[in-house]
């Protein structure tokens, strides 16, 4: 897909004009490059003849579907050279900023004013000459239908908005770039898959001298508008096209991108990110620098029963008189092939996670075609293992500091959520047992992966496996608080509700023994545990989201504070006080689905819009409700389905 091939890049990019020679249609786009020079070379009669135009010329390129019309004009608007360049035309790049075209016995050498001008011209010409018909690295690994859907999806401003509004994602990127400003000051930067160009603007804020922003979807046109409106055309150059197919005029000092999908690898944009290293200087850096995929066994009887219950529709012996039961087995297989995208209570995990690391500075594209992750879990709890949970962290390792972006279930929720892969046959394991096996991801041409998981309890020999399609996930997130696993209370919740303080004075002056002086009902919802369920994604038209506990980019390194090692969240047994997090929302193949189906930003019809319960089907107000009992107003962590935003007791 050459999404923006008709959009010229560089100084003097013109507008649509009349048809040029060589098949450029009546609506062909005209690109103008001033300051070009022309040298004519021939060898008639066996002697080399040269003729150079003494003055700088204006080069106009009329881009058509099969050819490009090229014309050079003098200052007096006299055409001194004109030709058509198609797929059959003999032509080639010369040096950094020149191009040679051979017509019969003569050749013309066109020298551009800057390498940037030549790069823009060359990228336009490749598309016009039908180079999109050639099999680039991207085309070899991607079905055309998948690529069309993918780039169409990311060409929508609404999807760019969704990603930009992920506070954790966008804020962490900006913090990582600005905190490591020395890695960007006066440097050349490449932004792979720039989208709206937001990361390029961050690089400019950090002092980058030149940023090449490559974008294959039609979003490149919008990015160009933003660059111009922010007066950064001298520093940010938007290059329409795929990074596998465009050309850059120079090597770069650092590559930035946001290439992560569900389970880190979905959408296969990481391969484009690694491909871009052909433009990276030997001492260059990449932001992000490394990626860690974490996986851990989980127990969730409710989720498991949900999938089986859906498949039981096909168990009916008489659906409008038709026996559907022959398809019940196929339905079970299909539902269990879907990775589940949502979030969960940390207490469903049964062992410390296993980590698989990809160093983007060292990895090659081929390394991501087949990813094998062996695992051996030492079980911390007894129960049924229903599958494996996945999440990822990426690190921006700069000269000044390392900043982490995490999608862990203990951190503020992002539009990547977490992903869970179910077993059709759960495994029973006891605390102290080991669960070993392999997770194998095989890349497919649908910009995703086929997942094969095999797991075995070593002590009993019981084994389970499953095949899953990462391209077809089940988006389960509803905006409600994830439920803790059954049996999470080790003291009486009812007693804890009243035994959390000394005396509570109602506004009427009545003193109730055993009640606290400032009682927060959110502690009741937590069930006596210190797990604070603040990991909701705000639905449409909700109140202000409280990000007090999730400062952007504040995860400097996993399990390390200011250089001193501390026990990370997965060291040893899982403490009952592990917290969950704050908020956010999304849609396809990460979506950034980088396409697929999307999660609506409004509460699904018929589902509760209230955290932790409430029967309302409308979108809830996340943190606006105030609850008072004769004292100061208490902010409710859990929204309630009430007609007003304030409740008062004893008034």
Curated annotation (Swiss-Prot):
Record-level GO BP terms: cell population proliferation; chromatin remodeling; endochondral bone morphogenesis; estrogen receptor signaling pathway; methylation; mRNA processing; negative regulation of dendrite development; nuclear receptor-mediated steroid hormone signaling pathway
Gene of this entry: Carm1
Residue numbers spanned by region Required for nuclear translocation: 347-380
UniProt domain SAM-dependent MTase PRMT-type: residue ranges: 147-454
Activity regulation remarks: Methylation of H3R17 (H3R17me) by CARM1 is stimulated by preacetylation of H3 'Lys-18' (H3K18ac) H3 'Lys-23' (H3K23ac) by EP300 and blocked by citrullination of H3 'Arg-17' (H3R17ci) by PADI4.
Gene Ontology MF term list: DNA-binding transcription factor binding; histone arginine N-methyltransferase activity; histone H3R17 methyltransferase activity; histone H3R2 methyltransferase activity; histone H3R26 methyltransferase activity; histone methyltransferase activity; lysine-acetylated histone binding; protein homodimerization activity
Species classification: Eukaryota, Metazoa, Chordata, Craniata, Vertebrata
PROSITE patterns: SAM_MT_PRMT
Entry comment on modification after translation: Auto-methylated on Arg-551. Methylation enhances transcription coactivator activity. Methylation is required for its role in the regulation of pre-mRNA alternative splicing.
InterPro entries: Arg_MeTrfase, Histone-Arg_MeTrfase_N, PH-like_dom_sf, PRMT_dom, SAM-dependent_MTases_sf
Pfam families, A to Z: CARM1, PrmA, PRMT_C
Catalytic activity: L-arginyl-[protein] + 2 S-adenosyl-L-methionine = N(omega),N(omega)-dimethyl-L-arginyl-[protein] + 2 S-adenosyl-L-homocysteine + 2 H(+)
Subunit structure: Homodimer. Interacts with NR1H4. Interacts with SNRPC. Interacts with the C-terminus of NCOA2/GRIP1, NCO3/ACTR and NCOA1/SRC1. Part of a complex consisting of CARM1, EP300/P300 and NCOA2/GRIP1. Interacts with FLII, TP53, myogenic factor MEF2, EP300/P300, TRIM24, CREBBP and CTNNB1. Interacts with RELA. Identified in a complex containing CARM1, TRIM24 and NCOA2/GRIP1. Interacts with NCOA3/SRC3. Interacts with SKP2. Interacts (via PH domain-like fold) with C9orf72. Interacts with PARP1; promoting PARP1 recruimtent to replication forks.
Cross-link (Glycyl lysine isopeptide (Lys-Gly) (interchain with G-Cter in ubiquitin)): 228
Function: Methylates (mono- and asymmetric dimethylation) the guanidino nitrogens of arginyl residues in several proteins involved in DNA packaging, transcription regulation, pre-mRNA splicing, and mRNA stability. Recruited to promoters upon gene activation together with histone acetyltransferases from EP300/P300 and p160 families, methylates histone H3 at 'Arg-17' (H3R17me), forming mainly asymmetric dimethylarginine (H3R17me2a), leading to activation of transcription via chromatin remodeling.
EC number(s) stated in the UniProt entry for this protein: 2.1.1.319
Family: Belongs to the class I-like SAM-binding methyltransferase superfamily. Protein arginine N-methyltransferase family.
Protein name: Histone-arginine methyltransferase CARM1
The species this protein was found in: Rattus norvegicus
Entry keyword annotation includes Transcription: yes
List of residues that carry Dimethylated arginine: 551
Keyword annotations from UniProtKB, A to Z: Chromatin regulator, Chromosome, Cytoplasm, Isopeptide bond, Methylation, Methyltransferase, mRNA processing, mRNA splicing, Nucleus, Phosphoprotein, S-adenosyl-L-methionine, Transcription, Transcription regulation, Transferase, Ubl conjugation
Sites where the protein binds S-adenosyl-L-methionine: 160, 169, 193, 215, 244, 272
The keyword Nucleus appears for this protein: yes
Subcellular location field: Nucleus; Cytoplasm; Chromosome
